[in-house]
């Protein structure tokens, strides 16, 4: 069946899935969008509703590179709402499948959230926060009625909302975890984005071995020296097992990214060799892993 989306001259055109995220300000639209992004969706924030059909057409022309599109729609005025209705009707006439996810919360929860960040509601004008909430709720009433999925976030924290989104959109796949393993030198300071820190200074320093000093932990002889030290292999085995446990917990909590910082004195020998070994272990467990040697070559 033809979809009506213009894909002339594009072989194997695939019409992307489309999810439209909308709802009350402060109800968790950004969190829902970030969850879909982490699940591999192409997310566009605050796209004018009139451009949604164009976005779908561009996705269809990507030859499968953009197979799932999520658009966050912030309806702040009647004209935007009318444009959204027109775009949805246009997509429906072209047989494009779309889902609307609507995020809502109680007045009390929304007031509490706006007060906690000390920001006004975008529609309150010179009135109170609750006035803005009332205006937005009335403006979105019809869209809420058209929603395929309504999520009330009044009593949900960020992790619980992510779990609900995962349940709807992750399918049977376990959420992926992406790890950055970063070697560093303590004398240059801790990485500010580290979630976990490993200190390899309990092992002898190859710096004091003249024939190894010029090389880095990427060198096979340096790596062999490090992991032939007493306790080195046992540490690697035990820490890899600990990471397996931590990774499972991160997935349950909806955490998608983790940075493991592995340090030694200068970030040249022990930390580099260990980072490479840990990254290989993580990759073997199915964790998408990137290795960064922050301070190598800095001395």
Curated annotation (Swiss-Prot):
InterPro entries: P-loop_NTPase, RapZ-like, RapZ-like_N, RapZ_C. Transmembrane segments: none annotated. One of its GO terms (molecular function) is GTP binding. Disulfide bonds: none annotated. It comes from the Bacteria. The keyword Nucleotide-binding applies. ATP binds at residues 23-30. SUPFAM superfamilies: P-loop containing nucleoside triphosphate hydrolases. GTP binds at residues 74-77. Keywords: ATP-binding, GTP-binding, Nucleotide-binding. Displays ATPase and GTPase activities. Belongs to the RapZ-like family. This is Nucleotide-binding protein SAV_6292. It comes from Streptomyces avermitilis (strain ATCC 31267 / DSM 46492 / JCM 5070 / NBRC 14893 / NCIMB 12804 / NRRL 8165 / MA-4680).
């Amino acid at each position: 069946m033809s979809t009506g989306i213009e894909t002339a001259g594009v072989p194997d055109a695939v019409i992307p899935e489309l999810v439209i995220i909308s709802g009350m300000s402060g109800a968790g639209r950004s969190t829902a969008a970030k969850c879909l992004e982490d699940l591999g969706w192409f997310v566009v924030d605050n796209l004018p509703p009139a451009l949604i059909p164009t976005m779908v057409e561009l996705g269809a022309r990507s030859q499968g590179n953009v197979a799932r599109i999520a658009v966050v729609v912030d309806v702040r005025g009647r004209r935007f709402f009318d444009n959204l209705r027109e775009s949805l009707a246009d997509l429906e006439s072209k047989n494009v499948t779309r889902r609307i996810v609507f995020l809502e919360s109680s007045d009390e929860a929304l007031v509490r959230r706006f007060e906690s960040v000390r920001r006004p509601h975008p529609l309150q004008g010179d009135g109170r926060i609750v006035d803005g909430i009332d205006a937005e709720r009335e403006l979105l009433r019809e869209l809420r009625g058209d929603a395929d999925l309504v999520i009330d976030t009044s009593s949900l924290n960020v992790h619980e909302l992510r779990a609900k989104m995962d349940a709807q959109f992750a399918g049977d796949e376990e959420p992926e975890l992406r790890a950055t393993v970063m070697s560093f030198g303590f004398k240059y300071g801790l990485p500010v984005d580290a979630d976990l820190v490993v200190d390899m200074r309990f092992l002898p320093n190859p710096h004091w071995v003249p024939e190894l000093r010029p090389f880095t932990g990427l060198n096979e002889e340096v790596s062999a020296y490090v992991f032939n030290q007493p306790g080195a292999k046992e540490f690697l085995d035990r820490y890899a097992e600990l990471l397996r446990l931590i990774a499972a917990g991160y997935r349950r909590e909806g955490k998608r990214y983790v940075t493991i910082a592995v340090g030694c004195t200068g970030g040249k020998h022990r930390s580099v060799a260990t980072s490479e070994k840990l990254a290989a272990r993580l990759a073997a467990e199915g964790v998408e892993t990137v290795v960064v040697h922050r301070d190598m070559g800095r001395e």
